[in-house]
Amino acid sequence: MMDADIFEQFIDQLGRYVRERLIPAEKEILETDKIPDAIVNEMRDLGLFGLTIPEEFGGAGMNITQYVRTIRTLSYAMPCYRSMISINIGMVCSAFKNGGTEAQKAEWLPRLAAGDIASFGLTEPGSGSDSAAMQTSAVKSGNGWVLNGTKRYITNAPYA
C-alpha cells in the first residue's frame, strides 16, 4: 500500500493534471481520435501505468481503495484516459500478478509499470465478450507467432 500522505499528495497532483492538461486536450482527441503522444508520455511520468504493480517491480503498490480513488479522480476527464490505464492494470498487469510465473512477472511487470502499453483483444464478431467462445488462435511459428481470427474494440491496439 502506498503511504497515505504520499497518496494524498499524488491525488492532489493528479486532480490538477486532469483539470489543467487532460480536460483541455479533449477537443483535440475528439477531432483526431487519438490521445496525443505528449500526454501518454506525461501519464508514464506520473506513474499511471503502474498504480497497483508492487513496488519491487517498479510500480506504486497501491491497494484497491487507492486505485479506485485514483481512477475516480482521472474520470473527471473523458474516458479514453481511464480506459488506457485500466486495460494495462486491470486486464494485463492483474493477469501477470495473479497467474504469471516469477520469470514472467520479472520480465513484464517492470515494463508495464514504466508505461509500456498493453492491449487486450477479447471481443470477437461471433462471440462478443464471451471469453469461453473465442475463436482467435495464436500458434508459435519459428521466431514469431501466427495469429488467426478477428477482433473488435481492442483498447490500446494503436499503442501496443
Where are these regions (language model features)?
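Flavin-dependent oxidoreductase catalytic core characteristic
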Residues: 1-20, 140-141
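Glycine-rich flavin
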Residues: 23-160
